[in-house]
Amino acid sequence: MATTRSRRGERGPSDRRHVGLTLPRELKQRVIDAADVLHWSVGDWVLAAAAEHGPCLRTALGTLALRRRPRVHDAAFTALYLTAEERDELDDQAVACGLNRSAFVTAVARLGLGEDVEVVVADLRDAADVPGQDG
């Protein structure tokens, strides 16, 4: 399926590949709906959310030692269509925040949907404090 950018001629659809991650099922549907409103692909919406909210998330997390894989209840596999450069950019932001791709995308998606940064960080902090959970 062509993305908004490929339809505008900025990227060929063949330049993009599946990039997998897991999201809470309810959040996944909210992200799909938000992208749909803008007539964007989910990948484009996630990239925009990461660009807008990634720096704020990184600042809010500070030096907090987080679990790299917080447990996700009712997780749903999600495939984003991204170029290699877009995937690397997303992963670089995740690593800078001390998170894996799924946790980072979950956090910036929640921020992009209007949740407060303190609530998102508190949930990550709670995951960091749960003993005996190795992702």
Language-model features, listed with the residues they occupy:
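Short, basic amphipathic alpha-helical segments that act as recognition/interaction helices
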Residues: 40-63, 99-123
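Conserved small-residue-rich
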Residues: 72-113, 117
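Intrinsic disorder/low-complexity segments
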Residues: 3, 21, 35-36, 80, ...
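General helical structural elements
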Residues: 32-34, 62, 91, 105, ...
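Alpha-helical oligomerization segments
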Residues: 123-135
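Short Lys/Arg-rich basic patches
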Residues: 1-25, 58-85, 94, 132-135
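Residue-level detector of intrinsically disordered, flexible termini
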Residues: 1, 33, 48-50, 59, ...
